[in-house]
Amino acid sequence: MSEQEIWKKVLEVAESEISKSTFNTFLKDTELKEIRDNVAIIFVIHEFYAEWLNSNYKEVIQTIMKDVIGYEVEPKFFTAEQLAELDETSRKSNTPSEPQRQIIEYGHEGTDQFNTHNTFDTFVIGPGNRFPHAASLAVAEAPAQAYNPLFIYGGVGLGKTHLMHAIGHHVLSNQPNAKVLYTSSEKFTNDFIKSIRNNEPEAFREKYRNIDVLLIDDIQFIQNKEQTQEEFFHTFNELHQNKKQIVISSDRPPKEIAKLEDRLRSRFEWGLIVDITPPDYETRMAILQKKIEEENLEIPAEALNYIANQIQSNIRELEGALTRLLAYSKLQGRPITTELAAEALKDIIQVPKSKKITIQDIQKVVGHYYNVRIEDFSAKKRTKSIAYPRQIAMYLSRELTDFSLPKIGEEFGGRDHTTVIHAHEKIAKDIKADTIFKQEVEDLEKEIRNQ
C-alpha cells in the first residue's frame, strides 16, 4: 500500500473511534508523508496540532497503524517547517557506512537523543515526585556512586521519561565526553533481534555495554521475552560490575512485572526503587503556570484552575489540555475564559470521569483483602489460601476489564487462558451458591471501582 492508502485507512478507523469535533479539528487534514526507520512521519498544518496530537493521540494512532500495516511504527506529527528541518538533518547525515557502525553509533548522540525541554530546571516538584526527583538528581551528580540501579516506576505521563532525559542532560553537562545511551526496552529488543539476524552480536554488545550511563524506558515490555531477558541480564551485569550507571523505568515495581526472571528482578532491586504518583492540585497548578510562563502567555487564573480541577490523571493529559485550549482560543478568535475552557475540553473531560481499571488494581485490592502478596498471584503456589484469591482476582479481571483471556493469564504468571476460564466459571458458581460470598465479591468490586 502507498502512504496515501495507508493513511486513508487509518483515518477511516480513527474517525469511528474518536469524537467528531476532535477528528475534524486535529486529524482530518493530516497527511502521512513516509514511514522511515519504523517512524511514521505525519504532516499537520499547525504547531499546536503537532504538539497536541503527539501528547494525546499518539498511542491511539500507533494502535490503528499496527492493525492497518501489520507491524508497529511510532507516529510523529510535524508541521511543514519541522519537516523541512527534519529533511535537512537527514540529508546532512545520509552518508554511507557499514551496517555494524550504524548499530554502534545509534544512541551515542549526546544531548540530541534527549528532549531539550526535559531538564531538572523544568521539572515541577510536588509531593508525588519529590523523592524520585531527588534520587534522579543524586544519580546525575554522581553516576554509579549514589544508587545503582535507580528504578523509577509510575503510571503513564507522570514524568518518568522527563527525569530520565534530565539525568542524561545533567551527566553530559558535567561530563561532555561521557557515553550516555537512552533507549526503550522495545528498542533494545529490536536491536537484539537485528543483531541476531545480521550476525552482529559484537556490534550490539559494543553499543549497549561500552557506555557510562544506560537509561532504559518501559522495562516491563521485556516480560515474556526469554532471550531478550537473557541478553539484558548479561548487559546489566557487565555495566554494574564496571561501575556504570543504570536507570530503569517501568509502569510497575519489579515484583509486579509478570514473567520476569527472578535473577533480573533481584538485580532491579539492588539499588533504589522510587515511585511517582499523580500530581496533587497545587502541583498541577504549578505545572500549568510554568508552562504558560515558558510560552510567555497570559491566561486567567480561573481558566487554569478549571483545567487543574478537571484533569487529575497525569501531567501529559494536563499539558495536552492546555495546548488544546490555546489552539481552540486561537482558531475561534476568542479570549480564554473558564467558559471557553469548558467548551474546548468537553470532549476529553468526562463527568464523572471513571478511572480505567487495571489487573494490577484488582490484584492489589484482592491481595490486601485476603492477605496475599502481589507476587503470589504470579507464583506457582497452589495452596488454597493463595489459589482461591487468585481465582477471585481472575474472575474480577474478566468482569471489570476488557483484557483478553491470554492477557489476563499473562498477568497471573503466564497462566493458560483455559485456567482463566476455569477460575471464572468456578467463582461464578460459588457466587450463585453462597450469598455471603456473593456479598464479599461485590464489596471487592466496589472497592476496586472506587480506588
From Swiss-Prot:
Domain I is involved in oligomerization and binding regulators, domain II is flexibile and of varying length in different bacteria, domain III forms the AAA+ region, while domain IV binds dsDNA. Residues 1-71 are annotated as: Domain I, interacts with DnaA modulators. Keywords: ATP-binding, Cytoplasm, DNA replication, DNA-binding, Lipid-binding, Nucleotide-binding. It comes from Staphylococcus haemolyticus (strain JCSC1435). Belongs to the DnaA family. It is found in: Cytoplasm. It holds the Pfam family Bac_DnaA. It comes from the Bacteria. ATP binds at residues 157, 159-161. Residues 71-112 are annotated as: Domain II. InterPro entries: AAA+_ATPase (IPR003593), Chromosome_initiator_DnaA (IPR001957), Chromosome_initiator_DnaA-like (IPR020591), Chromosome_initiator_DnaA_CS (IPR018312), DnaA_C (IPR013159), DnaA_dom (IPR013317), DnaA_N_dom (IPR024633), DnaA_N_sf (IPR038454). Plays an essential role in the initiation and regulation of chromosomal replication. ATP-DnaA binds to the origin of replication (oriC) to initiate formation of the DNA replication initiation complex once per cell cycle. Binds the DnaA box (a 9 base pair repeat at the origin) and separates the double-stranded (ds)DNA. Forms a right-handed helical filament on oriC DNA; dsDNA binds to the exterior of the filament while single-stranded (ss)DNA is stabiized in the filament's interior. GO terms for molecular function: ATP binding; ATP hydrolysis activity; DNA replication origin binding; lipid binding. The gene is dnaA. Oligomerizes as a right-handed, spiral filament on DNA at oriC. Residues 330-451 are annotated as: Domain IV, binds dsDNA. HAMAP family: DnaA_bact. One of its GO terms (cellular component) is cytoplasm. Residues 113-329 are annotated as: Domain III, AAA+ region. One of its GO terms (biological process) is regulation of DNA replication. This is Chromosomal replication initiator protein DnaA.
